[in-house]
Each structure stands twice: as C-alpha cells, then as structure tokens.
Amino acid sequence: MSVRIEHDTFGEIEVPADKYWGAQTERSKRNFPVGKERMPIEVVYGFAQLKRGAALANHALGKLSDAKKDAIVYACDRVLNKELDEHFPLVVWQTGSGTQSNMNVNEVVSYVANTYLKEQGIDESIHPNDDVNKSQSSNDTFPTAMHVALYNEVETKLEPALKTLRDTFKQKEEQYHDIIKIGRTHLQDATPIRLGQEISGWRYMLDKCETLLSESKAHILNLAIGGTAVGTGINAHPEFGDKVAKFIAENTGYPFVSSENKFHALTAHDEVVQLHGTLKALATDLMKIANDVRWLASGPRAGLAEISIPENEPGSSIMPGKVNPTQCEMLTMVAVQVMGNDTAVGIASSQGNFELNVYKPVILLNTLQSIYLLADGMDTFNNNCAVGIEPIPENIDNYLNQSLMLVTALNPHIGYEKAASIAKKAHREGLTLKESAIDSGYVTEEQFEQWIKPEDMVEPK
C-alpha cells in the first residue's frame, strides 16, 4: 500500500496515500478498532454545514482571508455533494466528545481545500486546526453537527413517512366508515364499533405524534456553536456563534439559531432526550397498530380474520401455503429497538459531568438509528401492508351477530342487572341473545328488535 507521512503533536504517522484524512484520523482508526458502527455520514454532512458556516463567519469577522474562505467552502460543498464519503472511516466508539470525528472533517476539508488553492495558483495553505477549526472546539462542534443532522433527518425522512402512513389510514377510515363490527376490550367482546372508527384511532395516534414531533424538533434548532471548550466562548468572536447559525440556516433552509446558554448546550442533551421521547411515543403507537392489524388478520380459518392483508411471501419452510403477517412483525421489532434506544439515550444524556457530556456519539448513533428505523419501517409497512388492508364482511357480521355484548343497549330500558342475566343465560345455555332476552320475560320480541340495533350503538345517543 502506498503511503504518505502526516504529523500531529504526537509526531509522524503513515497514512494511505489515496485517503484525504490526516494524522489524528489515522491514530483514531488504530486506537479504536471497536465494533462496526461507523460515525453516521449524516453527521459528517452536519459537520460540513458547520465548517462551511464557520468559514463564512470567520471571514465576515476579519479572521479568514478571501482565498481560505473560498477554499474551505469549496471543500465543504464537495462533502455535502457526497463526493468524499470514503474519507470518513471512523467508528462511533471513540472519545465521548467526538473529537476524532471533528478532526477527521477538519483534516479532509483542509486536504481538499489545499488542493483547490494549489490548483488556483494561490500561495496560501490551510491548517485543519488553525483555519478549518478556527474559533471552534470539538465540544461545541459535535453537538452542533449532531443537531443539524438530526433535524434534517426528521424533516426529510421521518415526517414524510409518518404523513404517508397517516394518510393511508385516513383513506381507510373513510372507506370503511359504514362497516360495523364488534369492538373488543381486554381481548373480550365489547360493544359495536365502526371499522372506520377503529382505524381513526390509529390515524389519530399518528396525528398526535406528528404534533409532538413538530414540538420536540423545534428544540433541536438550538446550536452549541460559539461555546468553544467549556461554554465561555474562549478564542471565538462574541458574534461568531450567531453568524455561524445564520449561515447554516441560510444554506439548509432550516431556522437554526445559536443556543441562548452555551454551558447547557455542551453539558446537557435534554433536547435530544425529548426528541427521542417522541420517537419512543411513536414506536409505542406503531407497536399497538401493528399488533391490532395482525390480530384482526389472524387466521385464515382459526383466527379472527376480520381483515385481510397482502400476502407478500411464503411464511413457513415446513408448512406449505402458510402466509404470515411479516410486515407487522417487522414493525413491532422496530418499535422494540427504538424503545431500547430510548433507554440508552436517556442514560447517556444523564452523564454530563461538569462542563461537558462525553457520551455524545452514542446519543447520536441511537437517535439517528431510531429515526431511520421508524421512517423505513413506516414506509415499508405502508407500502406492503396498510394500503392493502381490506375487510372480510362475512366474518365481521358473524362476530357482530353472535356477540352477547349487544345486550348493553338494553341497559337504559331494563337496567344493568337484568341485562346481565340475559347475557349470562345466553352464554350458559347456548342461546342467541334474542332467544335469551325473550325467554327471560324482560323484553318482547318487538322491543328487542327496536332496541338492539348495532347501527344505533356506534355513536352517542
């Protein structure tokens, strides 16, 4: 392998000649051969937005020349265009401040920027610390890049997937409004409900989660940049943080601002905890929805079988013809993983000792994974399951007509205890509800037909 020699304050080190990183990145690769979880490329793009904004801010404040500003912006734009992904090899399991990843970005941007300056015939050079990282510390850059990445992924991936699934349920809710089925509570028969009403509960869960997500992501717009090492802003111009946030906002289209309190921004990640709490809430709702769907579709001959769902693939390697609710199973596993991630994020956020939380990479990893899993899970569930949900009317009607809980409609006319005795008699003696009611002498056949109407039992009266 062809190599070149790079150096840092620890001395010289060999780096692959075809890679753009420098000494600190190479040391991190060697010092942390831990796991397979690479630093998510989305946070690298967040860093690129930050380094781009920092170059513009430093230039505006008279701290960076025109040529250096242009070169750094050029290099950052190449990162954002996904041209340099191969040059960011580090794993998540490194220093808890993310210093090695910050330096990885500094080194790659510096390398590309220097190549640009050389090609332009400009006699200046860019240093990864003195220029690309000017007015910054890993302690304020990593949380800034983390927030930029998280906000973008929620905005571009999670929210669209959530809205698509919600809209599918809205369409099903309206389509199946007139189908009346038996409701169930405690896994036991209950009073009638419209299939559309049942689905409306699923739809409203996603409506509510969309609102919660909008509220929680607003806090992610606060950026730590400008706090530098411990929140005091040492080595940074007083206007630096605000200017960087402004430039990031202009380039992303998102209204990022510099955090009001940098001491908080470096040592606490409660804003991400709140965001992930919303992801957990969404996961719990999706777990419930997926379980309802697979229960209602259970069968085909020995289950509830009130709805059918698409048959996507063979379900068994031994039982011919078996088809399983695989999309529901996928979504419930996604939900379980997100709930586990929430625990990790909460514990990690609680570990902010003094001026710095040093669990930032694991907070980022778990939160991004939850966003990806939920977004992909909802998209896949929608496309391969939800859009194909259809009622099985004969089974729905059979359960409805057999249910003893229709007796609830008699409460206002004969009282709870007499109605209960009718239901118990029917169950004990194998009678229909109508037969038991008439046999009890509490109601006539005419009264039963008048009072026991499922279509009158699905709205307040």
From Swiss-Prot:
Q: Which pathway does the record list?
A: Carbohydrate metabolism; tricarboxylic acid cycle; (S)-malate from fumarate: step 1/1
Q: Does the keyword Lyase apply?
A: yes
> Where does this protein reside within or beyond the cell?
Cytoplasm
Q: What is its EC number?
A: 4.2.1.2
Q: Which residues cross the membrane?
A: none
Sorted alphabetically, the Gene Ontology BP terms of this entry are:
fumarate metabolic process; malate metabolic process; tricarboxylic acid cycle
Q: Which CDD domains match?
A: Fumarase_classII
Q: Which UniProt keywords apply?
A: Cytoplasm, Lyase, Tricarboxylic acid cycle
- Residues holding substrate: 97-99, 127-130, 137-139, 185, 317, 322-324
> Which residues carry the site feature described as Important for catalytic activity?
329
Q: Which GO terms describe its molecular function?
A: fumarate hydratase activity
Tell me which family the UniProt entry assigns to this protein.
Belongs to the class-II fumarase/aspartase family. Fumarase subfamily.
Its UniProt miscellaneous note says: There are 2 substrate-binding sites: the catalytic A site, and the non-catalytic B site that may play a role in the transfer of substrate or product between the active site and the solvent. Alternatively, the B site may bind allosteric effectors.
What name goes with this protein?
Fumarate hydratase class II
Natural source organism: Staphylococcus saprophyticus subsp. saprophyticus (strain ATCC 15305 / DSM 20229 / NCIMB 8711 / NCTC 7292 / S-41)
Gene name for this UniProt entry: fumC
